[in-house]
């Protein structure tokens, strides 16, 4: 199958080389030119996911890329999503739906089946859009993963598309990364690489030029451009927790997030990280929970195991002490389930079957069931009747007296989550709460911030996507890029 000129793939020499960001930038750049473009990632491994318009889930990076294309997210944009639930295993999601969990060895054999889903999704996008902009995963030169590859060159070879190779110069060794990656590819794969992009450069480009000249002479391939290091660009991280904060002055609300082993959808906290009046702290193993106005228990892919880890670290006692001194506590999704009295996993969906005691802060019990709830929702927060939008991704069914005091009333008539009698503890299944300006402000006031400055997080994200497209215009060889996409250019 040949889609040359319609499909362009971005691969990286390493993880976090800038693949997601470059694809986002190229998508908006093409969309601004009036090109019908769609993002695509054959296989993603991440615990940050988004709910699509067709009722499935994909990686959040692809949802941001869809926004860059001015499209609603769709499951075809990320047909295979792997959500790790143990150190050696993951839940396998095909076309937005969880199909099974398996260990790494079993998944290696399953890749042939997964590839069928990948090619079917790509074919649908290629038929519907002029350009499909593809993001690879990790590095194409992982020798142990090359057999049955569906994420990098295995996919590129299957659809016969050109590849751009991006490398991060800020971490050092950029020329070794690029040349070394090429050396580890097969002849046909090496031929497929049509150029390089160097990412996160800071300094005088004239001092880099001799290295660029050497690279082109050594490889016979062009450098398509050098993107500058941008410190204040804040798009959602694909998997690693982004702890960077905007410059802040004046009084700030202290918010603490305990980082659990299987934390999921930590992009929930990006609006707080960027809020000028919030001091956000992620606390990891071996650290005590510091004094805070608000503690937020995040989502989790393995709630009972993460609850056990929370206790092992002594954080349960710290949370109770926090409440005794008047602090506020919020649980999101798995965090809500932890706040209840019992958590049951009779089918062993997240590990060994069994039950665990919760923190006992809300009169609730949760039972994990095989059917996962996936919804984009709108509603109103019980605090200040603030309007909000968010999304549900969970397998739990929660029951109990505390549900009579819901955290959110949804527009479809359902009640979501619960509040404690004294009002100091609240839990919800909804991700994305802090992205809604009014709801975020209401939650910050509830936590003790008196004069809240409203921040439009959606506008910040849109601004940064536009800035990325501007960088493409200024720093990359747009003529060559258009040619690789099969688009006319002056």
Curated annotation (Swiss-Prot):
InterPro entries: Class_I_gatase-like, CobQ/CobB/MinD/ParA_Nub-bd_dom, CobQ_GATase1, CobQ_N, CobQ_synth, GATase_3, P-loop_NTPase. Gene3D superfamilies: 3.40.50.880, P-loop containing nucleotide triphosphate hydrolases. The active site is at 333 (nucleophile), 431. Keywords: Cobalamin biosynthesis, Glutamine amidotransferase. It comes from the Bacteria. It holds the Pfam family GATase_3. PROSITE patterns: GATASE_COBBQ (PS51274). Residues 252-439 form the GATase cobBQ-type domain. One of its GO terms (biological process) is cobalamin biosynthetic process. GO terms for molecular function: ABC-type vitamin B12 transporter activity; catalytic activity. Pathway: Cofactor biosynthesis; adenosylcobalamin biosynthesis. HAMAP family: CobQ (MF_00028). Catalyzes amidations at positions B, D, E, and G on adenosylcobyrinic A,C-diamide. NH(2) groups are provided by glutamine, and one molecule of ATP is hydrogenolyzed for each amidation. Belongs to the CobB/CobQ family. CobQ subfamily. This is Cobyric acid synthase. The lineage of its organism: Bacteria, Pseudomonadati, Pseudomonadota, Gammaproteobacteria, Pseudomonadales.
């Amino acid at each position: 199958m040949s889609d040359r000129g319609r499909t362009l793939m971005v691969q990286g020499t390493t993880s976090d080389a800038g693949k997601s960001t470059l694809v986002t930038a190229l998508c908006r750049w093409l969309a601004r030119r009036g090109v019908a473009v769609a993002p695509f990632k054959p296989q993603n491994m991440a615990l940050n996911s988004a709910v699509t318009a067709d009722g499935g889930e994909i990686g959040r990076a692809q949802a941001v890329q869809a926004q860059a294309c001015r499209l609603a997210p769709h499951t075809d944009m990320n047909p295979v999503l792997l959500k790790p639930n143990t150190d050696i295993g993951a839940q396998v999601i095909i076309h937005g739906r969880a199909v099974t969990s398996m260990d790494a060895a079993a998944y290696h054999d399953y890749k042939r089946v997964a590839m069928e889903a990948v090619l079917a999704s790509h074919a649908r996008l290629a038929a519907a859009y002029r350009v499909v902009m593809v993001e690879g995963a990790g590095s194409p030169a992982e020798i142990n993963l090359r057999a049955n590859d569906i994420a990098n060159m295995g996919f590129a070879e299957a659809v016969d598309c050109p590849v751009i190779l991006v490398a991060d110069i800020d971490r050092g060794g950029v020329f070794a990364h690029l040349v070394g990656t090429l050396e580890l590819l097969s002849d046909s794969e090496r031929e497929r690489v049509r150029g390089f992009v160097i990412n996160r450069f800071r300094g005088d480009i004239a001092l880099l030029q001799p290295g660029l000249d050497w690279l082109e002479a050594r490889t016979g391939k062009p450098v398509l451009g050098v993107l500058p290091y941008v410190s204040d660009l804040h798009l959602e991280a694909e998997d690693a927790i982004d702890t960077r904060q905007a410059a802040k002055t004046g009084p700030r609300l202290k918010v603490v997030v305990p980082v659990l082993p299987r934390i999921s959808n930590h992009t929930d906290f990006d609006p707080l990280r960027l809020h000028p009046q919030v001091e956000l702290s992620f606390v990891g193993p071996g650290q005590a929970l510091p004094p805070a106005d608000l503690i937020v228990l995040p989502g989790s892919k393995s709630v009972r195991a993460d609850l056990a880890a929370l206790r092992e670290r002594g954080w349960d006692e710290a949370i109770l002490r926090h409440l005794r001194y008047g602090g506020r506590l919020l649980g999101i999704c798995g965090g809500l389930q932890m706040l209840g009295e019992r958590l049951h996993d009779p089918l062993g969906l997240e590990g060994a079957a069994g039950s665990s005691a919760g923190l006992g802060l809300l009169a609730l019990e949760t039972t994990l069931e095989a059917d996962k709830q996936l919804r984009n929702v709108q509603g109103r927060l019980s605090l200040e009747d603030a309007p909000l939008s968010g999304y549900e991704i969970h397998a739990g069914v929660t029951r109990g007296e505390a549900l009579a005091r819901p955290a959110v009333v949804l527009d479809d008539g359902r009640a979501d989550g619960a509040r404690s009698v004294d009002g100091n503890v609240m839990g919800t299944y909804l991700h994305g709460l802090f992205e809604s300006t009014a709801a975020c402000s209401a939650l910050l006031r509830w936590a003790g911030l008196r004069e809240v400055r409203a921040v439009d997080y959606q506008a910040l994200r849109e601004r940064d996507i536009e800035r990325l497209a501007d960088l493409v215009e200024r720093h990359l060889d747009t003529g060559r890029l258009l040619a690789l996409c099969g688009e006319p250019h002056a």
